[in-house]
Amino acid sequence: LFIDRNILSSLLQFCKEGHIQSAEAKRIGVLMTWSRLCGIDISAGLAVRERASQRHSQSSALLELQKFFDVFDQYPLQMWFQVATGRLNKIPQITFSGKVAYGISVDYSDPGDHYEMAVASLLHLVWLYRNNDAAPLEKIRDFYLWLYDNLLISEYLLVYAAMLFTNQSKIKAPKHANSNSLKAIISGCENQAWDISYLTNWSTLYSEPERYDKEFLFATNDNLLK
C-alpha cells in the first residue's frame, strides 16, 4: 500500500505530538489497523521521495524513512484500533531513534522520470489551457499528440486534461496557471506533477499483475487524486 505525502506527514505529526485533529486521527487509525489486520505492508517511499527531492537531500530521506519504521516498532495494533474507533484521541508521543535507515539503494533525492515527465506534460497542458482560441476537443487532441510525439502516453494525464479542458466540476488547473510569472507557472506545475507521478508510478505495478505475486494499492487524502 503506497501512501502519499499528506498521509505520511499526518502520521508522523500524530506520533510526534501525540494528537492531531480528530477526523484525521481516525483516518490514520483506520489505515494502520486495516493494513495490519490484513497483513498489508505500507510503503512511504514515494512520499519520502517527494520531500527529499525538493530538498535535494538523501540524508533527510533516510532519516524520515527511519522515523516511519520507528512508528511500526513502537506502537501496538490495539492502540491504532482504539484510535480508529474513536475511543482514543491522544497517543503516547514517540521517541524517534534518531538513526538513518540503512541498506537503502534508492536515491530519494532524485525525483525520478515519472515526475519529470509529469512536469513537462503539465507545462504543455498549461500552454494549451491559456489558449482561449482553441476548442476543448482541439486542446485534448493536441495534448494527446504532444504526449505521443514527445513522451509516453499516460492515462492519468489524459483523463486530467480531458476533465480540465471540458470544465468538469472541481477539476482545477495547476496553481498559478494564469500567472504572468513563468517562475510561478513552473512552480504550480511542479506541485501538481507530484500528484500525477504518484498515480503513474503506481500504475506501472498494478497494470501488469502477471509480473508480480502481490497486489498494489494507493492511499491518499488529496481530493483531486480521489
Where are these regions (language model features)?
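Long, internal scaffold/assembly segments composed of regular secondary structure
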Residues: D222-L224
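Active-site-proximal, substrate-binding regions of enzyme catalytic domains
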Residues: L1-F216, K226
